[in-house]
From Swiss-Prot:
It catalyses: tRNA(Ala) + L-alanine + ATP = L-alanyl-tRNA(Ala) + AMP + diphosphate. Consists of three domains; the N-terminal catalytic domain, the editing domain and the C-terminal C-Ala domain. The editing domain removes incorrectly charged amino acids, while the C-Ala domain, along with tRNA(Ala), serves as a bridge to cooperatively bring together the editing and aminoacylation centers thus stimulating deacylation of misacylated tRNAs. Its main location: cytoplasm. The keyword tRNA-binding applies. Its EC number is 6.1.1.7. The lineage of its organism: Bacteria, Pseudomonadati, Pseudomonadota, Gammaproteobacteria, Enterobacterales. Zn(2+) binds at H564, H568, C666, H670. Belongs to the class-II aminoacyl-tRNA synthetase family. The gene is alaS. This is Alanine--tRNA ligase. One of its GO terms (molecular function) is ATP binding. Homotetramer. InterPro entries: aa-tRNA-synth_II/BPL/LPL, Ala-tRNA-lgiase_IIc, Ala-tRNA-ligase_IIc_anticod-bd, Ala-tRNA-synth_IIc_core, Ala-tRNA-synth_IIc_N, Ala-tRNA_ligase, Ala_tRNA_ligase_euk/bac, DHHA1_dom. Its cofactor is Zn(2+). NCBIfam families: alaS.
Length: 876
């Protein structure tokens, strides 16, 4: 019996664990601190800084099963998903990595053993082919002489992409930086399937399928294109879980593996589909994976960047459900089946199931309201089409007006053998496409980045003053030996009390000083394992090797500690008051305020905000001890410690506990006891995205300041109302009631004045071909009274055309009224449009009533004078 996908995943990790590799959990689909990458799209993403020499780990071998998304840029698989055997928006990348440890020999031997050993995957050796880079004789000889693959199944691939080192078998991180040749392993499905081996004219067929890519990072590419050998060559490999599952389960399409068969059956059940070969089932089965995991990792549907890509995928899935005949919301119902089929890889998703389902349901309901209208408009346009291409402007209008992603437009057109003018669409969508575009590499010159080989020891948990030594200096990203007064720089010390920004807590400020210099620290950041003090040398000079005294701004750090500890208390309180679906989606902790983003689907009620405040303040009054313990990551999770969204953790973690109330993983700085916080107050609660709320709060002196400010405002209002705080509510109600009464009386007076003005105006109407025409500019009349006046005048004048205007604060307000017996000849909307155009405005409305505005008051007299001629022409 063949292995399940879950068993294949586990076997891969177990094999490399047996070879001394650290099993590392999948990182978030949202890359950590990497703005150049839209989504995690390869297993090596979380180790990028290790490969670049910017970070160090306590292991030199690692293995992962990494969740990946490719949609939205160079790796945009969206339009092909469901129509080919191997395109996905979401996939899992199995990988093993060596950071300056083993190299080509072991990497190749490990791969061969896992694939062919009877204990592991037991693939027939004669079915495996390999490629190597044309000049990589070392890899070729390992495959031929050590592994024993016949020469005819080892293929050299040269620079087949039109430039030096531009090859399917040469991997580059970017224009500069680590790169090297790679060897790829292919599986031959047999001659009953069309296709040729790699490098042949028939290589795009489905017979020979790449299952594993092994990259040998051995060069550092310079800006001038030269290749310098890396001092410690590394290995980065990737094998698509879905691809190897298809091979091991003896099927030719990824969509026929056990995981997808189960999901496709679930899709058929919720949509009512009966034909299990329908490609729309594949589309939806793929899309639920990317959508659910993206939401679980904090991405919310929106019209920008990652949220826009998520929205496109959701809407494409909903549209395919619509094609299958789904009559009600269905997509969210697939989260449960997905969790079941993902096994241990779905544990994070299971914890957030309710939140993910709610976001999907809300988005689907929102799109359902526009889908029908958008499809109808597209049908109209296609019916009028004379050629075989839909113009880009129409495709953009569908997006802009109906939120209809171009992918959906292309899908509909594809079914009718019609192309979409993508160039025209791109021109209209350039800005949105720029925001959503995924960088093809890592988009930076890594030779210019700050690289710190040494590590800094952080001692700020116990010290705010410390003596250290300068180990590195950087100016404009470049290492220097010394800096002088007035220069801005980054200073790295061997040990420091300064906390570097992470976990939502801002970096420390303070001073580095010595006998002859003073360096003002304005921020502190991490650079791999080093801590950089960012600021300006106020006096003297500073050079590498100098001894310094590092002094943290103690008062500022104290305020930050209170805010950070209060954040933990508030997180726990939110889960008690609102439910355990609450999870952190982001945070900011500085010396003035704490800001906390969390998953919740509706605005908090005033009583819920009060309950959270009361609960936090109750823990403050309990004066609970705040304790930290260092333990293994898995032990911390077993203890119930909550992890912070988007953070990376080592295998040994710091667990922060506040009595029996809160336990979280946290590397930040905190108060000693909850009582130190003093007071906690929420100052705002708002929404930041669908399903995400934001609270801002203050503590300690900041909270007391808000109490004083509220009290001062209350006293001022009481003084103005000639009352005291005890009966203030009654006073305000009385004033509001009196105000409402006066406004009502004022409105009645205005209406009486307008009626009188209308009576006076009616005598100014002139006859134009049997129709009364009245055109007038009014002074002292509110724009909102114009409509009432037109109605009165129409009643008085019978067959009539009326144009009234007024100017308030430099803005022109216009209205046109036409009696219904005249609308077949003169339409109010056309008339008002003609006038508005002359005063720099626009407007519209019904044939019998239309309004407009304008900005050019000086042009109003001439515009009104033109009405008579225009009307006369229409009435002839």
């Amino acid at each position: 019996m063949s292995k399940s996908t879950a068993e294949i995943r586990q076997a891969f990790l177990d094999f490399f664990h047996s070879k001394g590799h650290q099993v590392v959990a999948s990182s978030s689909l949202v890359p950590h601190n990497d703005p150049t990458l839209l989504f995690t799209n390869a297993g090596m993403n979380q180790f990028k800084d290790v490969f670049l020499g910017l970070d160090k780990r306590n292991y030199s071998r690692a293995t992962t099963s990494q969740r990946c998304v490719r949609a939205g840029g160079k790796h945009n698989d969206l339009e092909n998903v469901g129509y080919t055997a191997r395109h996905h928006t979401f996939f899992e990348m199995l990988g093993n990595f060596s950071f300056g440890d083993y190299f080509k020999h072991d990497a190749i031997q490990f791969a061969w053993e896992l694939l062919t050993s009877e204990k592991w995957f037991a693939l027939p050796k004669e079915r495996l082919w390999v490629t190597v880079y044309e000049s990589d004789d070392e890899a070729y000889e390992i495959w031929e002489k050590e592994v024993g693959i016949p020469r005819e199944r080892i293929i050299r691939i040269g620079d087949n992409k039109g430039a030096p080192y531009a090859s399917d078998n040469f991997w580059q991180m970017g224009d500069t930086g680590p790169c090297g040749p790679c060897t790829e392993i292919f599986y031959d499905h047999g001659d009953h399937i069309w296709g040729g081996p790699p490098g042949s004219p028939e290589e795009d067929g489905d017979r020979y399928i790449e299952i594993w890519n092994i990259v040998f990072m051995q060069f550092n590419r310079q800006a001038d294109g030269t290749m310098e050998p890396l001092p410690k060559p590394s290995v980065d490999t990737g094998m698509g879980l879905e691809r190897i599952a298809a091979v091991l389960q003896h099927v030719n399409s990824n969509y026929d593996i056990d995981l997808f068969r189960t999901l496709i059956q679930a899709v058929a059940k919720v949509t009512g589909a009966t034909d299990l070969s329908n490609k729309s089932l594949r589309v939806i089965a793929d899309h639920i994976r990317s959508c659910a995991f993206l939401i679980a990792d904090g991405v919310m549907p929106s019209n920008e960047s990652r949220g826009y890509v998520l929205r496109r995928i959701i809407r494409r899935a909903v549209r395919h459900g619509n094609m299958l005949g789904a009559k009600e919301t269905f997509f969210y119902k697939l989260v449960g089946p997905l969790i079941d089929v993902m096994g241990s890889a779905g544990e994070d998703l299971k914890r957030q199931q309710a939140q993910v389902e709610q976001v999907l349901k809300t988005e689907e309901e929102q799109f359902a309201r526009t889908l029908e209208r958008g499809l109808a408009l597209l049908d109209e346009e296609l019916a009028k089409l004379s050629g075989d291409t839909l113009d880009g402007e129409t495709a953009f209008r569908l997006y802009d007006t109906y939120g209809f992603p171009v992918d959906l437009t292309a899908d509909v057109c594809r079914e009718r053998n019609i192309k979409v003018d993508e160039a025209g669409f791109d021109a209209a969508m350039e800005e949105q496409r720029r925001r959503a575009r995924e960088a093809s590499g890592f988009g930076a010159d890594y030779n210019a980045m700050i690289r710190v080989d040494s590590a800094s020891e952080f001692k700020g948990y116990d010290h705010l003053e410390l003596n250290g030594k300068v180990t590195a200096l950087f100016v404009d990203g470049k290492a220097v030996d010394a800096i002088n007064a007035g220069q801005e720089a980054v200073v790295v010390l061997d040990q420091t009390p300064f906390y570097a920004e992470s976990g939502g807590q801002v970096g420390d400020k303070g001073e580095l000083k010595g006998a002859n210099f003073s360096f003002a620290v304005e921020d502190t950041q991490k650079y791999g394992q080093a801590i950089g003090h960012i600021g300006k040398l106020a006096a003297g000079s500073l050079k590498v090797g100098d001894a310094v005294q590092a002094d943290v701004d103690e008062a500022r750090r104290a305020r930050i500690r209170l805010n950070h500890s209060a954040t933990h208390l508030m997180h726990a309180a939110l889960r008690q008051v609102l439910g355990t679906h609450v999870s952190q989606k982001g945070s900011l902790v500085n010396d003035k305020v704490l800001r906390f983003d969390f998953s919740h689907n509706e605005a908090m009620k005033p009583e819920e905000i009060r309950a959270v405040e009361d609960l936090v303040n109750a823990q403050i009054r309990r004066n609970l001890p705040i304790e930290t313990n260092i333990m293994d990551l898995e032990a911390a999770k077993a203890k119930g410690a909550m992890a912070l969204f988007g953070e990376k953790y080592d295998e040994r973690v710091r667990v922060l506990s506040m009595g029996d109330f809160s336990t979280e993983l946290c590397g930040g700085t905190h108060a000693s006891r909850t009582g130190d916080i003093g007071l906690f107050r929420i100052i705002s609660e708002s929404g930041t995205a669908a399903g995400v709320r934001r609270i801002e709060a203050v503590t300690g002196e900041g909270a007391i300041a808000t109490v004083h400010a509220d009290s001062d405002r209350l006293s001022e209002v009481a003084h103005l109302l000639k009352g005291d705080s005890n009966n203030l509510a009654d006073k305000v109600r009385s004033v509001l009631e009196r105000t409402r009464q006066l406004e009502k009386e004022l409105q009645q007076l205005k209406e009486q004045a307008a009626a009188q003005e209308s009576a006076n105006l009616s005598s100014k109407a002139i006859d134009v071909n049997g129709v009364k025409l009245l055109v007038s500019e009014l002074s002292g009349v509110e724009p909102k009274m114009l409509r009432t006046m037109v109605d009165d005048l129409k009643n008085q004048l019978g067959s009539t055309i009326i144009v009234l205007a007024t100017v308030a604060e430099g803005k022109v307000s216009l209205i046109a009224g036409v009696s219904k017996d005249v609308t077949d000849r003169v339409k109010a909307g056309e008339l008002i449009g003609m006038v508005a155009q002359q005063v720099g405005g626009k407007g519209g409305g019904r044939p019998d009533m239309a309004q407009a505005g304008g900005t050019d008051a000086a042009a109003l007299p001439a515009a009104l004078a033109s009405v008579k001629g225009w009307v006369s022409a229409k009435l002839q």
